[in-house]
Structure formats: C-alpha cells, structure tokens
Amino acid sequence: MDSEKVIKRDNEYVLHTYNRNPIALAKGHGLYAEGPEGQKYLDFTSGIGVNSLGYCDLTWAEAVSEQAHKLQHTSNLYYTAPCGKLAKKLCKRTGMSKVFFGNSGAEANEGAIKAARKYSFDHYGKGRDVVITLVNSFHGRTIATLTATGQEVFHNYFGPFNEGFVYTTAGDIEGLRELVDRHTCAIMLELIQGEGGVMALDPEYVQAVRALCDEKDLVLIVDEVQTGVGRTGTFLCCEHYNLKPDIVTLAKGLGGGLPIGAVLLNEKTAEGMGPGSHGSTFGGNPVVCAGANVVVDRMDQSFLANVSERAVQLRAGLAKLPMVKNLSGIGLMVGIEFFGGIQAADVLAACREKGLLVLTAKSRLRLLPPLTLTAHDVEKALGILNEVLTEMEQKAPKEQA
C-alpha cells in the first residue's frame, strides 16, 4: 500500500489526537526508516526515545520472536522467567529493591504516586498525600499524571483534576521548602525536562531536594521515562547527579520498541505495596520483557562509553552550525535553541524533506537518536542540519543572526 493510501485510511478511521508528519513508514533497519515507496530517513527521534537499539536489532528481534513462539501472555497470576530476569537486572544495575512492571511511562508514574502515598499513609496516616512537582514538567496523559504535569497547556478541557498536586519552579529551593507542610508526601521531578524544552536541572538544586526529602521523610520520585536506560551516557541519569531516589520510573527506551513501564522502588517504599495494592493485566508481559532483557544486557560499559563519545561529537558539531544559539540536555538527549526568527518546527520540516527525522520540544529542536549511532551517522545528520540552517540563515534578516 502506498503512502497516500496509508495516510488517507489513518485520517479516516484513527482518532485525530496526533499532529503527524505527512509521511508513512513501512520498515526500518538500524538508524534508518523507510517509506512504502522506498524513501529513506535517518531517524534521530527513536520513536520519541523508544528505539534504543535502532530499528529491528537482530538480537532483540530474535529474542522477541522466540518468546512469542513460546508464550505470549499469562497475566500476573503466574510466574514467567523473562519478567523475573528483567527485574533482577534492573535492581542490580540501579541498587533498588523491587520493580513493578506496567505498559507506559504514564502508568509507571501512576504506580510511583500510589507507592509514595501508600508509604505516607502507612507511616503517618490519612491526609498526608500531596505530591509536589515542577513547573514545565511532563509526567503523562492520564488524569493523575496530567495533574502532576506542571504545564497549563495540558490542563485545558479535562477537569475536574485530581487533588493532591502542587507545583514549584525548578531551582527555587526556598520556594519548595515553603510548599512542604504536614500534607506533603512526595516530591516528583524529571532531571531533564524533556517536553519542557530539554532543560536539565541544576545539580545543587537536586541535592538540596534530596536533603529536604530526607529531613521531612518525603518520598523522592525521579521520572526517568525519557532519560533512563542509557540515553544520557549512564544507565540512569541519576548517576550524573550522584542521586539516590526512593522511586525511579522507566519506560520508553527500556523495551527497545515494545510498550513497557517500570517502577523501581527502594526498600522503604516497596514494603507497603502488597497483593492488591496495585496491578496491571499486561505488565511484565514475557514477550516485552524478552526484548527489554536484550536492551539492558547491551548497556555495558563499552556501549555507554560510545553513547557518551557520540554525544560529545554531536554537540561539538551542533555548536558550530549557523543560527544555533545554545544547546541543552545531557548525552544523546539534545535540545537546540536558534537565533531570531528561526522556528524549530520549520527546521523539522526542512530536515524531513532532506531525509532527517527530528523532534521539537517547546521552542527547541529536540534530538533523541538511537543509542547505536556511529560517528558516520552523526556526521551525516550534522551535514543535513548544516544545509537546512545555512539556507535559513541566507533568508533570515541579518540582525536575527
């Protein structure tokens, strides 16, 4: 089926909740996606940070296929080997005690909120249930995680929202301290605000938040849905901050392309979550976990060193491009701000026409390439971006540059 028919059918029958790019994708290999007519795209989006190993990694695909031919689903009424293997690997890699598996980042964050409130209820009783999150945060699109999201643009139309969430500005530790009262149970944050513009938090602020949580016995939840599993050059972004959260959430890159969410809990937050406290029919699915096991196994020291090296190469190249004002993020989670009237959406469209797929986040261009990229892949992407930005620079008024 050609692209036009694929797009037409989708527009006719799929709910229009996405502002899709006007292209269809049919298959992929490595860092390249291919359309029905054979047009190729160098993909620096990874399906929004999901395809950690690129498209159709052979070892990953074989593991998923092999498990699908053995046992595709059981529910959590029974034990399966892939689920337990993955949980053990995650605990050993992160120092956490237990893992709960769901199907998405939003579901993982819901589970984290529940676990934090359960800990507080068990130790302090009813009424200590407020979670503090950051302005410009993004934690999901369910009602609870949408309420946790500190961006008013996401709060239109869907009220009434859940009680129990308040917001503070990143970096303002005194403002945060003033918000904490006898009703507060947790502080929840992203170390890099992905949908908020790819903005990394200040390390001193993060350590001050940890200290405040220790002082007040608050649960510190770190949302690593987008930053986790090698994206920043370490298995968790927490490692860059020398941070030990009480709960960490993972999703996107963990499954390598299949839907998964994970709540990683330390001993104190795990102990109260007994049978019936939470659940997910599809959580810990053996096929998905088989793929995730391959992803986690791949994240050895050599692999992560290459991620860091490619990030240095990419950022150094981006800094030399015309119209680039500054860069944000950590590792291979990159935000690009432009001078003057250059719009990230226009850069995205122009890159797509030249065969490079990229993302936006607020006013910035966002790059989330597969973690398997090579030096050649980086240079090719930089070449396309250079072409696009040079053309835009020539058209822009001189004072904008």
Language-model features: where?
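Conserved N-terminal phosphate-binding loop of PLP-dependent enzymes in the Aspartate aminotransferase
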Residues: 1-401
